[in-house]
């Protein structure tokens, strides 16, 4: 793609997200979401082939449906209340329609079916943007309307997302699909805690983005897209394999890594609100995710590939200039658990 066109597309993508995040007006927020969607489609088809075209079509149809539903909710809300403010959703039907539209945009269950298919059909770079940056705009709107929506819908959808995110990834061999199901599960955790403590949603999102970026950068560096290609990584780049293993364990929420912090704080917050069955169910469903992360680690680092590699340090001689961000990302996504006591300052 022409660098000038690519820079224009990325600028539009960033402007759309920022417009939605900074807006308290429904129309401006909706316009930001539309800019975001239209800029994402050429990114999905950056490497033109039938798979990417199909993925872009699925993405467009899903997002357009969600945008139409959201606009309908906005117009009904204006007819009833006479104002465009995002925080004013007096009607339960309107808030449920807006919530359904945002859940569809985020890929939350039961509107999650498009996420694995679209992620698998695109390049690693497009998939990385889809599973990280594209979550910001819809979540910022959800953050503003969390007091107006039904907490039961949030809880049921969140639990279903955690279950689907764990169950769907069990038989997968494609890394992009595994990360897509991981995204669905993490979004479920964020959705459940939002009515109780929205700050924990932001913390969870931040750590999730750091971990996902780290994994995608390692995959892009080694051109790994499946468990078969990942099995070669131990011979080609042992240090990258170690970093990937640690980051996957962090993504699964194992202590003493960073991924344990948001899960621990969310379960603690729910328990403080006299909820016992809900956090217990969330923790049990999260074991499904941990299982397929462990299976991924076992197949790639604890089994030797049946071939010899006479040049063990081949990876030292390749160009690593594009990996400047990887060390700080790895540190932030694995070693921030000791900072947990300082989070009390934010409360």
Curated annotation (Swiss-Prot):
One of its GO terms (molecular function) is NADH dehydrogenase (ubiquinone) activity. Its main location: mitochondrion. GO terms for cellular component: mitochondrial inner membrane. It is a multi-pass membrane protein. It catalyses: a ubiquinone + NADH + 5 H(+)(in) = a ubiquinol + NAD(+) + 4 H(+)(out). The chain crosses the membrane at residues 26-46, 60-80, 96-116, 123-143, 151-171, 178-198, 200-220, 240-260, 274-294, 325-345. It is found in: Mitochondrion inner membrane. It comes from the Eukaryota. Keywords: Electron transport, Membrane, Mitochondrion, Mitochondrion inner membrane, NAD, Respiratory chain, Translocase, Transmembrane, Transmembrane helix, Transport, Ubiquinone. The keyword tRNA processing does not apply. The keyword Glycoprotein does not apply. Its EC number is 7.1.1.2. PANTHER family: NADH-UBIQUINONE OXIDOREDUCTASE CHAIN 2. Belongs to the complex I subunit 2 family. Core subunit of the mitochondrial membrane respiratory chain NADH dehydrogenase (Complex I) which catalyzes electron transfer from NADH through the respiratory chain, using ubiquinone as an electron acceptor. Essential for the catalytic activity and assembly of complex I. This is NADH-ubiquinone oxidoreductase chain 2. It comes from Dugong dugon. The lineage of its organism: Eukaryota, Metazoa, Chordata, Craniata, Vertebrata. The gene is MT-ND2.
């Amino acid at each position: 793609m022409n660098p000038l066109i690519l820079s224009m597309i990325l600028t539009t993508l960033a402007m759309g997200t920022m417009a939605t995040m900074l807006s308290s007006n429904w129309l401006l927020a909706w316009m930001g979401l539309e800019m975001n969607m239209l800029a994402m489609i050429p990114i999905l088809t950056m490497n033109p082939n039938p798979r990417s075209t199909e993925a872009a079509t699925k993405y467009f149809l899903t997002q357009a449906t969600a945008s139409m539903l959201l606009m309908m909710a906005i117009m009904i809300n204006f007819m009833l209340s006479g104002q465009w403010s995002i925080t004013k959703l007096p009607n339960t039907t309107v808030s449920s329609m807006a919530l359904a539209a945002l859940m569809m945009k985020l890929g939350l269950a039961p509107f999650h079916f498009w996420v694995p298919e679209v992620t698998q059909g695109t390049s690693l770079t497009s998939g990385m943007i889809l599973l990280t940056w594209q979550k910001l705009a819809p979540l910022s709107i959800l953050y503003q309307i969390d007091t107006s929506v039904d907490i039961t819908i949030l809880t049921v959808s969140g639990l279903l997302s955690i279950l689907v995110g764990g169950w769907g990834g069990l038989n997968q061999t494609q890394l992009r699909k595994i990360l897509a199901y991981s995204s669905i599960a993490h979004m479920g955790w964020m959705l459940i805690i939002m009515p109780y403590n929205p700050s924990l949603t932001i913390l969870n999102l931040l750590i999730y983005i750091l971990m996902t970026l780290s994994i995608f950068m390692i995959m892009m560096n080694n051109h790994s897209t499946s468990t078969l290609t990942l099995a070669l990584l131990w011979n080609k780049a042992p240090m990258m394999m170690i970093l990937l293993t640690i980051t996957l364990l962090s993504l699964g929420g194992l202590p003493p890594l960073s991924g344990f912090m948001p899960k621990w704080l969310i379960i603690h917050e729910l328990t403080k609100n006299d909820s016992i069955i809900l956090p217990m169910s969330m923790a049990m469903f999260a074991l499904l995710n941990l299982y397929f992360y462990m299976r991924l680690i076992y197949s790639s680092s604890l089994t030797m590939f049946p071939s010899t590699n006479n040049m063990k340090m081949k990876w030292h001689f390749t160009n690593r200039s594009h990996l400047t961000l990887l060390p700080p990302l790895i540190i932030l996504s694995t070693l921030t658990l000791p900072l947990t006591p300082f989070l009390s300052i934010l409360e």
